[in-house]
Amino acid sequence: METYYREEELKSLGLKKYGSNVKISRHAIIYRPEELEVGSNVRIDDFTTISGKVTLGSYIHIAQTCGLYGGDAGITMEDFTTLSSHSLIYAISNDYSGLSLACP
């Protein structure tokens, strides 16, 4: 079994957009893939979780066990950036909309 999704498998993930030479680990977790935009020459390693509105530029490496939680606000990583292992990025820390119970 290959470590990263093949090109035809990337199509079936339902990503909003992706460029060329994209490597996403089969062990990465992507929630709401229809909101994930990925540029070219991007690698996402094992056990990374991506959720919500996330935009990744080109020439990006996201190491293992990272978390990008974009929610509705969104996260953007610009070109030529890296995220070291175990790093977490939150667009918001809680839901203050009043539409649901948060932190009971």
Across the structure, where does each feature detected by a protein language model lie?
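Conserved catalytic submotifs in the C-terminal HATPase_c
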Residues: S25
